[in-house]
Swiss-Prot record:
A GO term for molecular function: ATP binding
Residues that hold ATP according to the record: A9, M10, S11, G12, G13, V14, D15, S16, M35, G123
Gene: mnmA
Name of the protein: tRNA-specific 2-thiouridylase MnmA
Active site per the UniProt annotation: C99, C195
Localization of this protein: Cytoplasm
Length: 379
C-alpha cells in the first residue's frame, strides 16, 4: 500500500466522512485516523466506540487505510487539567480551542508525519488561502457552521500542513453529497457540547472533580436571595439551574448570573437579562496569538467575537507591551466572560485571538480590586 500523503482526522461524523470522500475523489493518496481523546467512564456518553465503527466503515467504503491513536493521556494533561483549573478559579474556559491547538494540530499532526504524510485534513468548517507569502485562515462558507473561532490559535506552520476540504460547503450540500456517495454517516446527528460531558448534567459532572462549596446567592444590593452549591458551577448570563424559587417582594421574573466572587464565595444575580451588571464596553485579554505571527499594527480596528456564533462586533484593539490586548467596543457587549476566547476578524479573515482576562462590568471591576488587595497583602 502506498504511503499516504494526507491523513484525514476521522471522527465518525458526516463532516470528516465527506472531507475524506472529497480528497479520495480527487485521487489524493490518503488514510484515515481516528483519535480517542477521552477514556469512556462507563456511561457511554462520548459514543466513542460507535464513532470509531462509523469511521472504520467509511474508510472501508472509500478503500483507504484506517489508523487509530489514543491521545487520552495527552488530552487529560494538556486540555482537561487546564479546564478544571480555570473553573476552580471562577473562569469559564473553552476546551475546544485548547483541544485544537494541543491535540488535533499538534499531536495528530506529529502522528501523521510519523506515518509518512506531509499534510492533515479535518472536517472543520473553515478555509485556508495562501497569498502575499503567508497562510490566511478564513471563515467557512456556511457562516452558521463556521468554526474559525475555535481555530484561532493555529499558526503558519499548522496551516501550511492542513486542509479543510469541506470549508466551501453549506451543511445541506454536504449531507446531500454524503447521501449520493453512499456514506453511512449521511444522516448521522451532529455532535454537540463537550465530548467528555456528553448529555450529562454539567454541574453533576464537575462535582466529580470540584467538590461542592455552598455559599450565598445575593442581588446587586447584597441582599441574600438563596444558596448555591458552588460559584464555579455557574457562568455569566446563566439562567438555568439557579433553583431560585419565589422570593418575597420580588416579581416572578427569571434570575440571571451577573457575577461571582471567589474570595467571599458569593454568587450574584439579577432579574433582568439586560442588567447593567452584564454590560461592558472594554476588556483586557491575556497575551494574544496571531495567525500571521504578529499583530496588524500596535493599534487597529477590526471586528471581534467574545463567544461562538456571536455577531461580529466592531472594536478598537491596542496591543500592550506584554502582548495582551485592550479592546474597546463600539457598542455595549452582553455577558463578556473571563476565560472565554476573544477572536478577532478582518472581514472573513481570522486574525487571531486571546483569552479574556477581565472587563469593565461593575462586578468584574470589584473582583479585580479585591484580587489586587489580596495580592498586595501577600506581597
Amino acid at each position: 500500500m502506498n504511503t499516504p500523503r494526507i491523513i484525514v482526522a476521522m471522527s465518525g461524523g458526516v463532516d470528516s466522512s465527506v472531507a475524506a470522500w472529497r480528497l479520495n475523489s480527487q485521487r489524493e493518496t490518503i488514510a484515515g485516523l481516528f483519535m480517542r481523546n477521552w477514556t469512556d467512564d462507563g456511561n457511554g456518553q462520548c459514543h466513542a466506540e460507535e464513532d470509531r465503527r462509523d469511521a472504520v466503515a467509511v474508510c472501508g467504503i472509500l478503500g483507504i487505510a484506517f489508523h487509530f491513536r489514543d491521545f487520552s493521556h495527552e488530552y487529560w494533561q494538556e486540555v482537561f487539567t487546564h479546564f478544571l483549573a480555570e473553573y476552580a478559579n471562577g473562569r469559564t474556559p473553552n476546551p475546544d480551542v485548547l483541544c485544537n491547538r494541543e491535540i488535533k494540530f499538534k499531536h495528530f499532526l506529529e502522528t501523521a508525519r510519523e506515518l509518512g504524510a506531509d499534510s492533515i485534513a479535518t472536517g472543520h468548517y473553515a478555509r485556508i488561502k495562501h497569498y502575499r507569502q503567508r497562510w490566511h485562515l478564513l471563515r467557512g462558507a456556511d457562516r452558521s457552521k463556521d468554526q474559525s473561532y475555535f481555530l484561532h490559535q493555529l499558526g503558519q506552520e499548522q496551516l501550511a500542513a492542513t486542509m479543510f476540504p469541506i470549508g466551501d460547503l453549506e451543511k445541506p450540500q454536504l449531507r446531500q453529497l454524503a447521501h449520493q456517495a453512499g456514506l453511512p454517516t449521511h444522516a448521522k446527528k451532529d455532535s454537540t457540547g463537550i465530548c467528555f460531558i456528553g448529555e450529562r448534567n454539567f454541574r453533576e459532572f464537575l462535582k466529580q472533580y470540584l467538590p461542592a462549596q455552598p455559599g450565598e446567592i445575593r442581588d446587586p444590593q447584597e441582599q441574600r436571595i438563596a444558596e448555591h452549591p458552588g460559584v464555579f458551577y455557574f457562568t455569566l448570563g446563566q439562567r438555568q439551574g439557579l433553583n431560585i424559587g419565589g422570593v418575597r417582594n420580588r416579581p416572578p421574573s427569571p434570575w440571571y448570573v451577573i457575577g461571582k466572587d471567589l474570595a467571599t464565595n458569593v454568587l450574584y444575580v439579577d432579574q433582568h437579562r439586560d442588567s447593567p451588571f452584564l454590560q461592558s464596553r472594554w476588556l483586557r485579554s491575556e497575551p494574544a496569538h496571531w495567525v500571521s505571527g504578529s499583530p496588524p499594527a500596535p493599534t487597529f480596528t477590526c471586528t471581534a467575537q467574545t463567544r461562538y456564533r456571536q455577531a461580529d462586533e466592531p472594536c478598537k484593539v491596542t496591543v500592550r507591551n506584554d502582548g495582551s490586548l485592550d479592546v474597546d467596543f463600539t457598542q455595549t457587549q452582553w455577558a463578556v466572560t473571563p476565560g472565554q476566547s476573544l477572536v478577532l476578524y478582518d472581514g472573513n479573515e481570522c486574525l487571531g485571538g486571546a483569552v479574556i482576562a477581565t472587563t469593565d462590568a461593575p462586578l468584574e471591576r470589584k473582583r479585580a480590586r479585591n484580587l489586587s488587595k489580596t495580592e498586595n497583602v501577600l506581597q
